[in-house]
A protein has these predicted regions:
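A detector for small-residue-rich transmembrane helices and their helix-helix packing motifs
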Residues: 1-236
Length: 236
């Protein structure tokens, strides 16, 4: 299912979420220049650099950040940015701009390290040398936070060409279950990279996001809006 809208209106313009989306497209277009296409791999993250079993073009302490803004194809970036546009705005609305920015990068780091640990522990040496890139780990953290903050909101989307409406609880729950199943299949198949998809990054990011949202909500530091407030808020 492709999500198109969550039916919730943010109380404030989601400046951080929009800026992240713009930055991702800007970086994508930059690396699409003919003489720079090969350079995308130089800025990608390589799991083997963490345990020094290989030497990557960049230190892993830098490349985990740069890799979050890189994508391998148009469908890769469009899918990621669609999910971020639909779910990110209201997570930022609840967190506040600066906290959301820190959360996004922290989620990306946790997701990257989860994938790295799985690859180094269960994958082959060749898989540890496969470049990791994409924003999906950080976006998975956003989805996990949304799952906790807005479980009863309605997600409007498409299954193939058919419009559907489903609660966020079931949509994101099903999404997470799929990632979890695929990650476990990757384990038993000795393919921790999941056939080119970083499923462990998605699982790690989602769990991190859900835990952070739960803790911050319990501490009173995050204030998700209720549906009646959302209905009266300006549309963003």
């Amino acid at each position: 299912m492709l999500p198109l809208s969550d039916g919730l209106r943010a109380r404030r313009f989601p400046i951080v979420n929009v800026s992240i989306i713009v930055a991702n497209f800007a970086v994508w277009l930059f690396y699409e220049l003919p003489h720079l296409r090969h350079a995308v791999f130089e800025a990608s993250f390589y799991p083997c650099t963490v345990n020094n079993s290989c030497s990557g073009p960049e230190s892993w302490g830098v490349s985990w950040i740069t890799a979050m803004f890189l994508h391998g194809s148009w469908d890769h970036i469009l899918g990621n940015m669609l999910f971020l546009a639909v779910f990110g705005k209201n997570v930022e609305d609840a967190f506040g701009a600066l906290r959301y920015l820190a959360f996004y990068f922290a989620g990306g780091f946790v997701a990257t390290m989860t994938q790295t640990l799985a690859t180094l522990a269960f994958g082959t040496a060749a898989e540890a040398r496969v470049p990791n890139l994409g924003a999906s780990g950080a976006i998975a953290a956003v989805l996990g936070a949304y799952f906790v903050l807005y479980p009863n909101s309605n997600v409007f989307g498409l299954i193939v060409i058919f419009p559907v409406r489903i609660s966020a609880y079931f949509f994101l729950g099903a999404w997470f279950l799929y990632q979890l199943i695929e990650a476990n299949f990757g384990l038993f198949g000795s393919a921790a990279n999941g056939g080119g998809v970083a499923f462990f990054a998605h699982v790690g990011g989602f769990v991190f996001g859900a835990i952070v949202a739960w803790l911050l909500t319990g501490a009173g530091l995050v204030a998700p809006q209720d549906r009646s407030t959302a209905a009266r808020a300006p549309a963003y």
